[in-house]
A protein has these predicted regions:
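Positively charged n-region of N-terminal signal peptides that target proteins for export
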Residues: 1-4
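Bacterial N-terminal signal peptides
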Residues: 8-17
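Boundary at the C-terminal end of the N-terminal hydrophobic targeting segment
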Residues: 20-23
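Immediate post-signal-peptide N-terminus of mature secreted/exported proteins
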Residues: 25-81, 88, 137-142
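Non-transmembrane, amphipathic alpha-helical segments
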Residues: 38-49, 64-71, 90, 106-116, ...
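Extended amphipathic alpha-helical interaction segments
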Residues: 54-61, 110-196, 215-232
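Mid-chain, structured segments of secreted extracytoplasmic proteins
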Residues: 80-120
Length: 232
């Protein structure tokens, strides 16, 4: 009888202990959710690093034609440092691609060639923003900005690089198609379609004046796209 009682008590203790352990152990779903949050946090941190570095390349692409020599030197130095700081976190093949653009930036600066400088900066910008994932503002918006930088640098080259301007327009059209369906604001849709059409028509006519006007509108509209998506 005593053995039966002891056995029963022991069994009760074991069951209670197992129940407590089960209550404390994370369920597979909880573990999956925690892992998902961790991965999202890691990607958010990576996105922040990439976009922060990309800003210096963006500034260089925008100001390559207008900055004073001292300002340009400062912009180049900042882009170079930003690129070097983020490069170690990039995939191996991308590291080489970014290094190539950093080298091209320095060579263009030494040669006093603002169009090549702007183009290299734009390519560096493209490399970085293309690696972002799951951002509130789609990477396609940043790539539309890149297309505008490239088109503008081609336009200001001597001689004007009309063929590459057409390639830049086609790239922009591809990016626009990937996100235009997400935009419910009809006026923004219409304006952006118009800007891209005008950019292409300017190339067909080889009209520098029309091209300059169209690409300015495109880049202004990219800013509006950024605001639109950030508020969604």
């Amino acid at each position: 009888m005593r053995a039966t009682i002891v056995t029963g008590v022991f069994a009760g203790i074991v069951v209670a202990a197992l129940s407590a352990a089960a209550a404390q152990a994370p369920t597979p779903r909880a573990g999956t959710e925690q892992s998902g949050k961790s991965l999202k946090n890691d990607q958010d941190a990576a996105n922040s690093r990439l976009l922060a570095a990309a800003e210096f390349f963006e500034a260089l692409a925008e100001q390559a034609f207008s900055a004073t020599s001292s300002k340009l030197q400062n912009l180049v130095s900042k882009a170079e440092k930003a690129g070097q700081d983020v490069n170690a976190t990039l995939p191996a093949d991308t590291q080489g691609a970014l290094d190539k653009q950093l080298s091209a930036i320095k060579q263009a600066q030494k040669a006093n060639n603002p169009s090549e400088l702007a183009l290299a900066a734009a390519e560096g910008y493209k490399i970085l923003v293309s690696l972002t994932q799951g951002t509130k503002v789609p990477s396609a918006v940043s790539l539309l900005d890149y297309a505008g930088f490239r088109y503008n640098a081609d336009l200001k080259s001597n001689p004007t690089r009309w063929a590459d301007m057409q390639t830049a327009v086609e790239f922009a059209q591809e990016q626009w198609r990937s996100i235009s369906g997400q935009i419910s604001q009809a006026s923004l849709q219409k304006s952006f379609n118009s800007a891209l059409t005008r950019m292409e028509q300017a190339v067909e006519k080889k009209s520098a004046k029309a091209a300059a006007s169209a690409v300015k509108d495109e880049q202004d509209l990219v800013d509006k796209l950024e605001v639109y998506f950030s508020k969604k």
